[in-house]
Amino acid sequence: KEMQNRITADIAAFRLPRYAQIPEVGLYLEQVVRYINARLAPLGEPELTGSMVSNYVKQKLVPAPQKKLYTAEHLARLLFIAVVKPVVPLEGLRLMFSIQEECYPLQTAYDYFCDEFENMLGAAFGVAPAVEGLGETESDAKDLLRSTISATVNKVCLDRYLEEYRKRREQAETIVGKEISLL
């Protein structure tokens, strides 16, 4: 129960920054990496690295920075990539961005992603009941995004529980080891 409470507290406090909250001033690569990793730390997923960001630029998933500076557009795309990359391959991300560009402005799509991700994450961890019908329209693009978020949330759930069990086992082994050394 203690493990569940610790995870639930992390998830209850988790919020993705909305587009209007993302820094508008340009950030350098290392600042971008720190900003994104700080926001996503409660999810327990692998951290974003500078070389990963450079690769996403090279793969044209993220526009090239202007004078080595990354803007809110870059950060929104990188936050999305960092959250869903454990379940969506690069080619899938490319297709999703293409669909998004055809259907919704980045700010609208990103904010909807944040709302839906937090909604499903909270429901999966029992923090809050799922809110049905977020957003004003139904579309294939939103269905695709919801499926992506659902898969991502399930992976986050699994990873967090496995990590907590791993920590618990290590602690138990440490205690047993100390007891044996006392004999």
Functional labels for PLM-detected ranges:
Residues 1-101:
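Basic helix-turn-helix/winged-helix DNA-binding cores
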Residues 105-183:
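Intrinsically disordered, low-complexity, charge-dense segments enriched in Lys/Arg
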